[in-house]
Amino acid sequence: MRIAICEDEEFIQNSIEKNVEKCLEITGMAGKCECFVSAEELLEKGNMPYALYILDVEMKKLSGLELAEHIRTEDRNAVIIFMTNHSEMMQKAFDVQAFQYLVKPIDSDTAHNVIMRALRIIREKRNYIRFTNKLKDMIFYYDEVECIESRRRKIIVHTEKRDYEFYGSLSQIEAVS
């Protein structure tokens, strides 16, 4: 499982990352955190999609809420947790189906409980297929895939929203159930 943490304050970012790693260890789930200091960095360097996004609401250029809107255009099933200093922004988080909204300063036990609940939900969610090639790691949920075909060293995944085409072979499929 891949987890994105987008937080511009290094201390908070490190604290959340350690908490996530502890929760992964407790649940026995395999996972990897990737940390970003801005929404732009996540969009540019991140290998989306991620199963879990932990986002700071207030960032310099692109806010966590704007980033979440972008995430929802690509992945309606990801779990999103917001962090912020301002509880009055909580209502906007519901527009992007946020899982939880943490108000800073974040108590370590509260963060731990929220992350544990999020991981349980992810584990209980639907099954998915993962394709891995040199450029990208792509996850497709079973109920979104209409058909998968292989043609001339290319894999074409037909989904509800669009078709994805990339070089690879069917042997690169990892079905996770």
Positions of predicted regions on the chain:
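CheY-like receiver
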Residues: 41-44, 50-124
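Conserved binding/recognition cores within well-folded domains
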Residues: 113-177
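Short loop/edge segments at beta-strand edges and connector loops
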Residues: 37, 103, 168
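Non-catalytic signal-transmission and effector/linker regions of two-component phosphorelay proteins
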Residues: 1-4
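Short hydrophobic/Thr-rich beta-strand motif most characteristic of the beta2 strand and flanking loop
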Residues: 24-38
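Short alpha-helical segment
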Residues: 36-43, 173
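Charged phosphotransfer/docking patches of two-component systems
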Residues: 10-17, 90
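Conserved acidic carboxylate
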Residues: 7
